[in-house]
Structures are given as C-alpha cells and as structure tokens.
A protein has these predicted regions:
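Glycine-rich loop(s) and the adjacent beta-strand/alpha-helix scaffold that form part
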Residues: 272-329, 469-485
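Conserved redox-cofactor binding core of oxidoreductases
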Residues: 41-44, 48-62, 69, 73, ...
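Glycine-rich active-site loop/strand segments that organize a redox cofactor
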Residues: 137-168
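Glycine- and aromatic-enriched mobile tails/lids
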Residues: 1-2, 74-75, 80-90, 99, ...
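Extreme N-terminal leader/targeting segments of oxidoreductases
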Residues: 1-91
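An anion/pyrophosphate-binding glycine-rich loop and adjacent beta-alpha core
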Residues: 1-15, 21, 309-419, 485-492
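A glycine-rich dinucleotide-binding beta-alpha-beta segment and adjacent secondary-structure elements
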Residues: 53-67, 242-258, 405-458
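Short hydrophobic core segments
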Residues: 92-95, 267-278, 452
C-alpha cells in the first residue's frame, strides 16, 4: 500500500486492469513516432545544447554540461608532471573496470600481454553492474544476425556505423557462449535451452537474461575471471586517469593517474591504451535523475577529446522510459524493460493505455513526458509520472512469475511497502545511456594511434537510440575486440622513451584563444552534490595539480 493520496489514484488503474489487459495498443507509425520525438524528447530541446568552440568536434553541438567538461581547464599543469619518473610500465593499459574494461583485459592477457587495469572506484563499480533486463543475441532457429542487424540499425534511426552494428550482431552468439562457458548463470529451460524474451524494438525473442540481475551476474563473472588472471592483469583501484600521455609521434603511450583518496600522481607507460570508462549519467543532463553508477561522469570522453580523439553523436542520450518516480529514495533507479516485456503496460492517471509498452525507448520516454506535460500524468510529491501496471504480469503468466523473473524489482519496491504483485508503480524517464562517445572503427581504433575505446565511452554502435539488451552486448563484444586487437598490437610496438603532455599545453592555448570562460576543471571524476555549498567542490584531492 502507498498509504497516502496515491492509493486512490492506484484504484483507478486496478478498476480498469481486466479491460486494459485485453486491450492491445496499436504500434505508432513512423510519422507519429517522429512527431512525438520532435515535440517531447529531451534531445530535441535546442536550448539545452551548445556549440563546441575548441577541439576535434569544434562547431558541433553537445549538451551544455558535457561541453563545459570537454572545454574545461585540465586538472593538471603539464610542467609540474615528471614524465621521467615511471610508476607503471605495461603492454596494455586499460582505463575502466566495468564490462568493457574487464573483457578487454581478459582478451589482451589471453594473447600474452601484461595488462594494467586502472579504475577510479573498484572493479565492477560500473553501469554494467546496474544493467538488469538482459543481453541480445540471435541464436535461435527462427532468428538470425541479419534480423538482429535490421532491428538494431533501425532502432538507432539508421544512424549507427554499419560496420559496428554488423560486428555487434555477428559476434553476439559467440559472446553468449563465451559468457556461458565462463560461468554466467543464464535463465534456462529444464533441458538446458536458454530462455529468450522480447525487448522494445525487437522482432524476435532474443533477450537472454539472468532473472533481472543480468548485468550483475555478467559483471560478477568477468570480475572473477579478471582477478583469476592476477599473474598477467594488475588491478589498481580508486585511481583515475586524468590525462592521456603521448609520445613524440603523437601516439598514445600511457596516462597520468591520480589516486582519488590521496591526490597522489602516478605515471603509467604503455604500448596500447584502451579507454573503457563508461557513461555520463551523473552529469544529470537537463536536471534528470539517473540510473547510472556513482562514477559515470564522462571522464573517458574528456581525456580522449583532449588527446585529439573525435567524438560521434555526443549530442545523443538515452532516457530510459521507466525510471522509478516514487518514493524519493529510489528516484531515477532503473525499472527494467523486462517488466514491460513480461506484459506490464503504461497507464495514465485516467487508467488509459496510451501507448504500446514495447515501442523503442526514445518513443516511450517521449510518450511519458507528453502525458505528464499535457496533464494526464499522476501528480505526486516526488515526480509527476505515469503508472506501470505490474500486477498484469502474474495475471498473464501465472502467480509467482514476478518473484521468479524480476526479483530485483520486487525487492526494490517492497522495502518501501509497495508490493508490485498487487499494486502498480510510478515511473518517469531517467538518464540512462550515452548513445554517442568517442568515434571508433570495428576494431575499436580511434583517430589517435594506439588509443582504443570500447563500451559506452564509444560512439557509433547504437546510432542515436539504443535497443534494450544491446548495451551489455556492446561492452562484451567491443571490450573483447579491443583486447584482441591490443593483443596483436603490443607485440609490434616498443615502449616509448619520449613521453609528452604537449597536447595538453596546446589545448590550453586553444582554450585561451577561444576565450573559454569559467573555472570548471575536468575530468570531473566524481559528481558534486553540494546542495548549494561550494565547499563540497573541494572533496576531490588535488583539484588542480
């Protein structure tokens, strides 16, 4: 029970549940989708974006908050950094300890490389751990990578780089087998066949899941495998990369590292550098809550951009349609799309089903925003929202389905007295995914030599909208590809003796010439929740070095 004014609002949903269960809302036409996105999607609000004045993407648009970080003062002063004092020397430097970073480290070590994995929090503190619904792969008789390609490419508004989408879908079946062999406990039938379900925008049931703990289970397995390779993979945690180091040829040759607890600086020299730092939800674009982990602050984009790497679709973000909108304690937390794939429908305050629950994420997010703005949302003290009618799931599939299939969702709400088996829940879009990022090719190369990028920090895989289940797939497919590529490269590259931060000095000159204003410092490293108290800006040691 909600135990307040929302109980009466929930009764309207309950009264129409049987009727709504039988009602199937028509899919929107292409024209209807375009109109809805144009009017209500946050990415279409021009005043929330600004033109980049410096860097490889000069003249292009970016969210105001991201532009500030991309063009901010560097956290270090190059002349104060001693590049002759090397703390770590390695074949492959992996920056980031999520699904992409660990996959890359594992595959590079498989090729015989000595790997240094640095992460500003701990291995596994990543958006991979937060993912719930599942991972896509076309490995059933009625499906194919070609069909998966059509869904993913179309779902991304045909903006994805074809070679990246091709790699994503064709590597998917082998990635599922690899994860299964490593020990990921996928949902299976009694005969061992993997259970698959639909997601928004999928034409076939190809979603493989581990109940609704899919990301956590995959991350657990990758983390264990990483630590099991301690003879080849050295992990340094609570350490952020704050600048890429180059050599005299302009090739990536390592990174400046900073311990986030002490501010201590360390220099890592490497033959190949892989950025796998994840997303940017903790930038809270346009004030949206986020489903992202605490360290998602766009650091990888900042250090890559300053090193000269081009970005792609940096102006495209994904707002997951169903973030928790009540109670306050879980505002913005992800309500997995699996809830809708199991049959729960989106309902407005009048008890009406106003959209198909499995439209693509950008369309459903826009639909929720429309309902709220036009007065058909449910008013509450936390965030005006719409209902997600979860009791429909047990009605469709039988009592006990919720506890069996989405226990994480049940546990998240029951601690606040809301039983999703009996009561609907309130949802509103939450900042969930960075569609764009550093532009890569199919083997994760950027335009900066020896600098690879994988996972959510990259751009081009999903175009300008991502389908459910393709992010977990992305981090493993391209994390592996980056590791495999680095495993080939390191054997042909010599460690450089001429390390340089000249590109940082050049960036400062460009910044001065463009008359960039403000005192922001980047990379951000951790979000700042100072509630108006600027003293909290000093919480990271060595704010400038």
């Amino acid at each position: 029970m909600y135990g307040n004014y929302l109980d009466d609002a929930a009764k309207i949903v309950a009264a129409k549940r049987e009727e709504n269960l039988k009602f199937e809302h028509a899919r929107l036409t292409a024209e209807q989708k375009d109109d809805l996105l144009l009017k209500f999607h946050p990415d279409r609000i021009k005043k929330q974006f600004t033109e980049l004045k410096i860097g490889p993407n000069k003249g292009q648009q970016a969210p105001i908050e991201l532009a500030e970080m991309l063009q901010a003062k560097p956290r270090l002063e190059p002349e104060k950094i001693d590049l002759n004092h090397i703390d770590y020397e390695t074949d492959v430097l992996v920056i980031g300890g999520g699904g992409a970073g660990t996959s890359a480290a594992i595959m590079a070590s498989e090729a015989g490389a000595k790997v240094l994995l640095v992460t500003k929090l701990r291995v596994g503190d990543a958006n991979t751990m937060m993912a719930e619904g599942g991972i896509q792969a076309a490995d059933k008789p009625n499906d194919s990578p070609a069909q998966h390609y059509l869904d993913a490419f179309g779902g991304g508004h045909f903006d994805g780089k074809p070679e990246l989408v091709y790699t994503l879908v064709n590597k998917a079946p082998s990635v599922i087998k690899w994860l299964n062999d490593l020990g990921v406990e996928f949902d299976k039938m009694p005969d061992g066949t993997m259970v698959t379900t639909h997601g928004g925008g999928t034409s076939r049931k190809r979603m493989h899941a581990c109940k609704d703990y899919s990301g956590a289970e995959i991350m657990r397995t990758l983390r264990d495998e990483t630590f099991n390779r301690a003879d080849q993979i050295t992990v340094v945690d609570f350490t952020a990369a704050i600048e890429i180091i180059k050599n005299e040829k302009g090739e990536a040759a390592g990174a400046v590292l900073m311990n986030i607890e002490t501010g201590e600086i360390r220099i890592a020299k490497a033959k190949v550098v892989i950025i796998a730092t994840g997303g940017a939800g903790r930038m809270h674009y346009q004030g949206f809550p986020t489903s992202n982990h605490y360290g998602a602050t766009a650091d990888g984009l900042v250090i890559a951009y300053r090193a000269g790497a081009k970005l792609l679709y940096q102006d495209s973000l994904q707002y997951h349609p169903t973030g928790a909108a009540y109670p306050t304690q879980i505002l913005g937390k992800l309500v997995t799309e699996k809830v809708r794939s199991l049959g729960a429908k989106l309902i407005n305050k009048d008890g009406e089903v106003y959209i198909h629950p499995l439209e693509t994420r950008d369309v459903n997010a826009s639909g929720i925003i429309r309902e709220v703005r036009e007065g058909r949302g449910v008013h509450n003290d936390v965030q005006d929202a719409v209902w997600l009618d979860t009791p429909m799931i047990d009605m469709i599939h039988g009592e006990g389905t919720i506890l069996k299939s989405i226990p994480a969702m049940y546990n998240m709400f029951i601690k606040y007295g809301i039983d999703i088996r009996k009561e609907p829940i309130l949802v509103y879009p939450t900042l969930h995914y960075q569609n764009g990022g550093v532009e890569i090719d199919k083997t994760c190369h950027t335009n900066v030599a020896y600098l690879l990028v994988a996972g959510e920090a990259s751009g081009g895989v999903h175009g300008t909208n991502r389908l459910m289940g393709n992010s977990l797939l992305d981090v493993v497919v391209f994390g592996r590809e980056a590791g495999i590529e680095a495993g080939k490269m390191f054997k042909k590259i010599k460690l450089s003796d001429n390390l340089s931060l000249k590109h940082v000095k050049d960036f400062e000159k460009e910044r001065t010439a463009a008359k960039i204003k403000g005192n922001a410092v980047s990379p951000k490293i951790l979000p700042t929740y100072h509630h108006g108290n600027p003293e909290f800006e000093k919480e990271i040691p060595g704010a400038t070095l």
